[in-house]
């Protein structure tokens, strides 16, 4: 049985960690390095940093904080936001990131997934998918979601895009379920299961965790990792207690 991963997500904007609800109304959560160090010391398996404004503003991620994070933690971390080329990815990996994640740039240029996988190996290439469920239950991929003014439907359906990114060479998918983001009432299990059924690569659930049982429900579907932000930033769930709880439920967890 593969070890399940508990991942903390740190949304970065203007050099600070922020958190919104359903990708809106972002509030300051603290210093990037301090939070990274806190999570590294308190049992999180992996960190994901999303520069949520980089793609929307057509900016580059600051290499300075990426390098500082690498110096201050001893767990794997992934960086996302505005990565449009092999050169962008190479710089971030050279500054200490273990993986890079692409979202809107992959929708604009799907071949970027293949090029990154060939240059750095599939294990380094994560594709983030911002999935919105409309009033009819249709799953739609959105892009430029870091800013309410730029967020829009990409024209692709979630399930179609999940299949496509796998064929293009993605090594992992993070499914960001937009409707559930920050509301703490559980992952969208119906959506998660639909994606998991067609996913042949590691799948990470994101959006909706509010209590320990929510992580268990998601892991029972077979997914590889569960990502959360609000419950960890606000210390509503203790990471070490969560891991013990999941291990006691029979899951393979790194304590």
Curated annotation (Swiss-Prot):
CDD domains documented for this protein: HisF
Record flagged with keyword Manganese: no
Record localization: Cytoplasm
Metabolic or biological pathway, per its Swiss-Prot or TrEMBL entry: Amino-acid biosynthesis; L-histidine biosynthesis; L-histidine from 5-phospho-alpha-D-ribose 1-diphosphate: step 5/9
Gene3D superfamilies: Aldolase class I
BP GO annotations: L-histidine biosynthetic process
SUPFAM superfamilies: Ribulose-phoshate binding barrel
GO CC list: cytoplasm
Matching Pfam families: His_biosynth (PF00977)
Catalytic activity: 5-[(5-phospho-1-deoxy-D-ribulos-1-ylimino)methylamino]-1-(5-phospho-beta-D-ribosyl)imidazole-4-carboxamide + L-glutamine = D-erythro-1-(imidazol-4-yl)glycerol 3-phosphate + 5-amino-1-(5-phospho-beta-D-ribosyl)imidazole-4-carboxamide + L-glutamate + H(+)
Main location: cytoplasm
Domain of life: Bacteria
Catalytic residues of the enzyme: 11, 130
Known EC number: 4.3.2.10
Gene Ontology molecular functions: imidazoleglycerol-phosphate synthase activity; lyase activity
Keywords, comma-separated and alphabetical: Amino-acid biosynthesis, Cytoplasm, Histidine biosynthesis, Lyase
Subunit structure: Heterodimer of HisH and HisF.
PANTHER family with a match to the protein in the record: IMIDAZOLE GLYCEROL PHOSPHATE SYNTHASE HISHF, IMIDAZOLE GLYCEROL PHOSPHATE SYNTHASE SUBUNIT HISF/H IGP SYNTHASE SUBUNIT HISF/H
Task of the protein: IGPS catalyzes the conversion of PRFAR and glutamine to IGP, AICAR and glutamate. The HisF subunit catalyzes the cyclization activity that produces IGP and AICAR from PRFAR using the ammonia provided by the HisH subunit.
Homology family: Belongs to the HisA/HisF family.
Annotated HAMAP family: HisF
Name by which UniProt lists this protein: Imidazole glycerol phosphate synthase subunit HisF
Annotated organism of origin: Campylobacter jejuni subsp. doylei (strain ATCC BAA-1458 / RM4099 / 269.97)
Protein encoded by which gene: hisF
């Amino acid at each position: 049985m593969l070890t399940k991963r508990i991942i903390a997500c740190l949304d970065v904007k203007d050099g600070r960690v922020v958190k919104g609800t359903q990708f809106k109304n972002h509030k300051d959560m603290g210093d990037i390095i301090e939070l990274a160090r806190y999570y590294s010391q308190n049992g999180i398996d992996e960190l994901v940093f999303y520069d949520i404004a980089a793609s929307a503003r057509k900016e580059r991620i600051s290499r300075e904080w990426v390098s500082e994070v690498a110096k201050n933690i001893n767990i794997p971390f992934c960086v996302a936001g505005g990565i449009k080329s092999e050169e962008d990815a190479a710089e971030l990996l050279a500054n200490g990131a273990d993986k890079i994640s692409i979202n809107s740039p992959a929708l604009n240029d799907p071949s970027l997934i293949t090029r990154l996988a060939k240059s750095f190996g599939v294990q380094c290439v994560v594709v983030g998918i911002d999935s919105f469920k409309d009033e009819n239950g249709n799953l739609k991929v959105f892009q430029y979601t870091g800013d309410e003014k730029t967020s829009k439907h990409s024209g692709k359906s979630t399930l179609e895009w999940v299949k496509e990114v796998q064929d293009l060479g993605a090594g992992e998918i993070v499914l960001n379920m937009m409707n559930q983001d920050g509301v703490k009432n559980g992952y969208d299990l119906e959506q998660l299961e639909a994606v998991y059924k067609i996913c042949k690569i590691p799948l990470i659930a994101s959006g909706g965790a509010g209590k320990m049982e929510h992580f268990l429900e998601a892991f029972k579907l077979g997914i590889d990792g569960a990502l959360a932000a609000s419950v960890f930033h606000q210390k509503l769930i203790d990471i070490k207690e969560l891991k013990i709880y999941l291990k006691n439920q029979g899951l393979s967890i790194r304590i």
